[in-house]
Amino acid sequence: MNKFSKLALVGIVAAGSLAIYASPSFAAEVGSTTSKADITFKNDDGTTPTNPVDPTNPGDNVTPTDPDAPTPTTGKLRLDYVSNIHFGEQTISGSDTTYKAKYDEVLQSDGVTKKYVPTFAQVTDNRGTNAGWKLQVSNDQFKAGTEELTGAVLTLKDATLNSANVSKPTNASTVILNGNSLTQDVVNAPENSGMGVWTNAFGKTIGADETSENASVTLRVPGETKKAADEKYVTTLTWTLTDTPD
């Protein structure tokens, strides 16, 4: 008797459970309507340069401290910034010698804290056409007055592209400038790449300070080249941005 009652009770509970799950509820629709969202775009007027960003952390704006920083270009496709390159004072040597550049000093977004970043160039493409672009560079020979630093070779290597965007262009890992004014490719952004803000930096910056030297930006001077003491030798690098990628 007890066994039968127990089984009957279990059967009743199970049946009750099935009854509960077999009773779905339906929401009664009483009406619907539609709404819209819209946006209208206007052209970037191209008159306001984009702030330079940290080439090692492109989400942060920086302010270069070099008083002779190059003038940015204007337009919807523009060259925002290029580092000057400083090798400082060096002792004359009669042997072939390679000199390393200083890092580029910038102020972080607080306007106070200094940071030392690799030599870099920054391009902004706000055209909205996704047509691509190309950055090239050339230079003349280092000179002090009319005296050339014959045979001097400027090398920019270990290039790294950086951006908050993902449509990555391609870059030359090494750029060699012989002072012959021949144009060298730096960055090529084919169609559907290179939109927004992009930096191309030469070298790394971990732990750099005002005394650090960047082994990725070098000047090689032959030992047999004449060198005048207390004279500053200067080369002009011409950076050219075009809207005709490869």
Label each residue range with its predicted role.
Residues 4-8, 20, 24-246:
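Signature of Gram-negative chaperone-usher
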Residues 11-19:
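Bacterial N-terminal signal peptides
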